[in-house]
Amino acid sequence: MFRPARYEKDEYEKLIEEIEQKNIDFMLRQKERFPQSNVTLRTGVYYVTPECMSASYAIDVANYARQKVDNDSKCSVRFYDDEMQKRRTLENQIVNEMKEAIEQHQFKVYFQPKYSIKNREITGAEALIRWERENGEVLSPDSFISVYENNGKIVELDFYVFETVVKYLAKNQKEGRNQVPISINASSLHAMDSQTITLYMDILKKYDVDPSLVEIELTETAVVSEYESVRELFDEFQLHG
């Protein structure tokens, strides 16, 4: 929806109500026609300003706002505002800077110990990632993981983290230190590639690290149609570990 105008707060609220009502009316009509269907509508709104670069830009940012509608939200409408503009700019930077960030090792892996109160000892660790950007800004996983999940680049980042952890284990092994298993998150998108296990095992062999020292935890992002593939991948990880 596009309108070249400025709106006060009460006008925004009124417009939201109008769009929401149109969405509800449409869903009710579809429910009558297709009783077994489950129709959900999401609407993104961008107000065209004199600074708008093109119609395609307006459509892109309105669609971006639509994609940001929370599945659990009672409101199915999102406005493309200044805050969303900042978020979109950051996401574009996150996508464009990934290759360089990996090459320059800007993604840092830290280890959070798992401590057994009963045995009073460290029984393992969890690998956590932070992005220490060239400008000094530190980004938490919440800032970039979902972006890479959406464009598929999360697979490349997962392998980067995995190899970083394996290299750390190999270094400890060479120095004769006690080893504990380290758990690493991996996207369910790996289930779409039949070579995933081979690629992970190749990294372990490259550094001569025992597979039992690495625990793979698949993130819960798979849809129902992917569940079986994800389960099979998880079973294969367990088999090799």
Ranges and model annotations:
Residues V39-T40, V45-T49, K68-Q93, Y110, ...:
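Flexible, glycine/charge-rich interdomain/linker segments that couple
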Residues F2-E13, F34-P35, T40-A58, E83-K86, ...:
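Catalytic strand-loop-helix junctions within cyclic-nucleotide turnover domains
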Residues I16, V48-K74, D142, F237:
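Catalytic-core segments of nucleotide cyclases and related cyclic-nucleotide turnover enzymes
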Residues T40, Y47, N119-E126, K153-V230:
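Catalytic core of bacterial c-di-GMP phosphodiesterases, primarily the EAL and HD-GYP domains
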Residues A58-D81, E97-K108, N135:
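Catalytic/regulatory signature loops of cyclic-dinucleotide turnover enzymes
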Residues K86, L90-V147, N185, E217:
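Active-site core of bacterial EAL-family cyclic-dinucleotide phosphodiesterase domains
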Residues D25-L41, D70, E137, Q173-V180, ...:
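Catalytic core regions of nucleotide second-messenger enzymes
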Residues E13-F34, V61-N63, V161-K171:
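Alpha-helical scaffold within the catalytic cores of cyclic-nucleotide enzymes
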